[in-house]
Amino acid sequence: MKSLVTGGAGFIGSNLVEKLVKLGHKVIVLDNFSTGRLSNLNSIKDKIEFKKIDISKKNKLFDKYFKDVDWVFHLAGLADIIPSIENPKKYFDSNVIGTFNILESCKKANIKKLIYAASASCYGIPEKYPTSENSRISPQYPYALTKFLGEQLVIHWAKVYNMFNISL
């Protein structure tokens, strides 16, 4: 099994990569180190393929990393409220354009399985806990809105391009 993990040098991503390697997957990690650290992958760095890349800036080499991949785990993105208010374009580029680029590369490589790291922040301040997925969407900050838009892209690509996408 071959898996590609975006944001694989982050906390959640590096733990996922470690588990995938233990399960025998060949793993490609794409990360730009905006929040992750290569040191998070030290214990398995010889067992993975790592590419420093910004998913919001797609170039002609980008698609080659998706060749023969079975699963894409899209964990890359910016996550913080105050900086998203101060620089919403940076968050839009990372969380929306980056997700679009990942989906398009998956489509081009005929990858049918993608897992997307969503955010409960799209519900805003919940009216009740636990918050149901059927709750009203009410993003309060640019970060929450960009994660919601990314999730909508993932859902739409699943319907239109017959992909098996999961948003967590």
Model regions and ranges:
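N-terminal Rossmann-like NAD(P)+-binding domain of SDR-like oxidoreductases, especially those catalyzing
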Residues: 1-168
